[in-house]
Amino acid sequence: MKYRSAGVNVGVGTDGAASNNDLDMFEAMRQAAFLHKLVTGDPRVVSAQQALSMATIGGARALGMQDRLGSLEAGKLADVIAIRTDQPRQVPMYDPVSHLVYTTHGDDVVLTIVNGQVLMRDGVVKTLNEAQVIKDARAAADQVRKAVQ
């Protein structure tokens, strides 16, 4: 991570389904840590804590929004999630941050609060019809495919 050592902010995010077919931030954090370990041959490079920081405050800095989000602090937007920790892959949990980065998946999220508003509770989206959104997305994708053929 020579760029981080030089003081360059590094953020982790998803580019969208068009680039990697996955919108899972946990997978993005995991890959950020694993790929740097692979490239450098150093298992200590990009720790779980560093990957989490890159995905939270690092992402907020990349967007120029570190004063409003990216960390849990008074005066910032109340954007939080709760995850299930009763999955076999998460037991025993010695280091919560390590487990968050290396074993958690997007479908482990059971509660999502954005700016203080509950968007999902018990894995059910409360603010929109998820089935309809999926149906509309598939229809739009079909239209794009037909248009480019």
Predicted regions and their residues:
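His/Asp/Glu-enriched, well-ordered alpha-helical/loop segment
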Residues: 2-88, 101-105
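Active-site microenvironment of metallo-dependent hydrolases
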Residues: 53-149
